[in-house]
From Swiss-Prot:
Keywords: Antibiotic resistance, Cell inner membrane, Cell membrane, Cell shape, Cell wall biogenesis/degradation, Hydrolase, Membrane, Peptidoglycan synthesis, Transmembrane, Transmembrane helix. Bacitracin is thought to be involved in the inhibition of peptidoglycan synthesis by sequestering undecaprenyl diphosphate, thereby reducing the pool of lipid carrier available. It comes from the Bacteria. It is found in: Cell inner membrane. It holds the Pfam family BacA. Catalyzes the dephosphorylation of undecaprenyl diphosphate (UPP). Confers resistance to bacitracin. The keyword Zinc does not apply. The gene is uppP. GO terms for molecular function: undecaprenyl-diphosphatase activity. Belongs to the UppP family. HAMAP family: Undec_diphosphatase (MF_01006). Its EC number is 3.6.1.27. This is Undecaprenyl-diphosphatase. It is an enzyme of class 3 (hydrolase).
Length: 267
């Protein structure tokens, strides 16, 4: 992989991993436009840049993470349903690895965001801090997060929608979604390596790996901070609109044959 491509993919990962817009969809687009072969090194590269994004969350929220055991117990409660559901359905997920599924989930998720915001326009939120989240609510967020196993859904999008429906204010919904990414992404990465241990041996080009990792980390830190400030003042409707537009872009690319809805989606 060329260093410039590693930089661009690191930027894409950092920009989209924690925004409710589907990082998978953007990775498909970026990889295709750059003409990158989806080989074993690419899979290893993807794992490394995702680790950069995870480190970004830890960097931004380290104070909250070390305030006490309570937040970790809530994250455990949130991860539990995702982990259990993942173990049971993982072997069936390949059937969903299709570009048309991405199109449908991008558009559907965008519509849901818009409808939720319109329904909650003047509603008072019940949960205004991480400390107010109950273990039951954290568990429910984990159930919503498990929907992100469907390609194009967006892990952060699914968990944020769950938070909004449970009465979290926008910032708390986003913060808990970001924090829940830590155990979710670390364990998902470990599971991928367990299934394919050769992924580590394929990670032998240190310069592009380092560029991708550092870029994803720096961009993700900036995006997380910007996003939290943005949603403190505005709603999620712009992200809903963006998802719908992106969904129709993919629809055109697949329908016109520019992208292959089957093979090119299999990341």
């Amino acid at each position: 992989m060329e260093n410039l491509n590693a930089l661009i993919l690191g930027i894409i990962e950092g920009l989209t991993e924690f925004l409710p817009v589907s990082s998978t969809g953007h990775m498909i687009l970026g990889t295709t436009i750059l003409g990158i072969d989806i080989d074993e090194f690419w899979k290893s590269f993807l794992i490394i840049i995702q680790l950069g994004s995870i480190l970004a969350v830890i960097f931004v929220f380290w104070r909250k993470l070390f305030q006490g055991l309570d937040i970790w117990l809530k994250l455990a409660a949130g991860f539990f349903p995702t982990g259990v559901i993942g173990l049971f359905v993982a072997k069936y997920l390949n059937a969903l690895f299709n570009g048309w599924v991405v199109v449908g989930m991008l558009i559907f998720g965008g519509v849901v965001f818009i409808l939720i915001e319109l329904a909650h326009k003047n509603k008072q939120y019940r949960i205004n801090s991480l400390e107010e989240i109950s273990f039951k609510q954290a568990f429910c967020i984990g159930i919503f997060q498990s929907l992100a196993m469907i390609p194009g859904t967006s892990r952060s999008g699914a968990s944020i929608i769950g938070g909004l429906l449970l009465g979290f204010n926008r910032k708390v919904a986003a913060e808990f979604s970001f924090l829940l990414a830590i155990p979710t992404m670390i364990i998902a990465t470990a599971y991928s390596i367990y299934k394919e241990p050769e992924l580590l041996s394929n990670a032998n080009s240190l310069i592009p790996l380092g560029i991708g990792f550092i870029t994803a980390f720096v961009v993700a830190v900036l995006v997380i901070k910007f996003f939290l400030k943005f949603i403190s003042k505005f709603d999620f409707i712009p992200f809903g609109i963006y998802r719908i537009i992106l969904g129709f872009v993919f629809f055109y690319l697949y329908y016109s044959g520019i992208l292959n809805a089957g093979s090119e989606f299999k990341l």
